[in-house]
């Protein structure tokens, strides 16, 4: 029985060591600078005119903050309408969090080829739909890319000092 315990302990230890970490370049505060094709993206998702205008004219900041545990990070989505905070996020681990629409979502952050993906699956009825946001850098901008039915929208964020 003790050998099984040691094998399990070794496996768990290897899993913790192998946990993916958020790349250093993502840490910081980013302010929305401009968008491309965002209203078209929201229209494709079926959002009404009023909701689209509220989202389009809202201010947005993204904050990726370091955590005491190097395998975790804190994420904030700060808007003029509502702020959302996710604490102790681990790459690849699902967690339940509140979305900007005030409903519960199953949220997962993953990494692939230097890009960060934020996947939301609504857990309650409402206007919100399942979606994945892709974050990557192009020059000075953190770009948030989203698509639905071949309609792609992009939001461009500038790093704040």
UniProtKB/Swiss-Prot annotation:
Subcellular localization(s) per the UniProt record: Secreted
**InterPro entries in UniProt:** Calycin, Fatty_acid-bd, Lbp1-4
Q: Which domain of life is it from?
A: Eukaryota
What keywords would UniProt list here?
Lipid-binding, Secreted, Signal, Transport
Q: Predominant location of this chain? A: secreted
Q: May I ask which residue range the UniProt record assigns to the signal sequence?
A: 1-19
- Relate the protein's function as given in its record: May play a role in sequestering potentially toxic fatty acids and their peroxidation products, or it may be involved in the maintenance of the impermeable lipid layer of the eggshell.
Record family assignment: Belongs to the calycin superfamily. Fatty-acid binding protein (FABP) family.
What is the protein name stated in its UniProt record?
A: Fatty acid-binding protein homolog 2
Organism whose genome encodes this protein: Caenorhabditis elegans
């Amino acid at each position: 029985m003790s050998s099984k315990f040691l094998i399990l302990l070794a496996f768990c230890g290897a899993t913790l060591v192998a946990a993916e970490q958020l790349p250093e370049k993502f840490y910081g505060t980013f302010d929305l600078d401009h968008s491309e094709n965002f209203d078209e993206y929201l229209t494709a998702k079926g959002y009404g005119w009023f909701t689209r205008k509220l989202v389009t004219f809202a201010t947005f900041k993204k904050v990726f903050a370091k955590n005491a545990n190097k395998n975790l990070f804190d994420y904030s989505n700060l808007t003029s309408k509502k702020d959302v905070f996710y604490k102790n996020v681990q790459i690849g681990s699902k967690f339940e969090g509140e979305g900007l629409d005030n409903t519960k979502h199953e949220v997962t952050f993953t990494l692939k080829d230097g890009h960060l993906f934020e996947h939301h699956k609504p857990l309650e009825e409402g206007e919100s739909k399942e979606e994945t946001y892709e974050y990557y850098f192009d020059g000075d901008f953190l770009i948030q890319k989203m698509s639905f039915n071949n309609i792609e929208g992009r939001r461009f964020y500038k790093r704040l000092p």
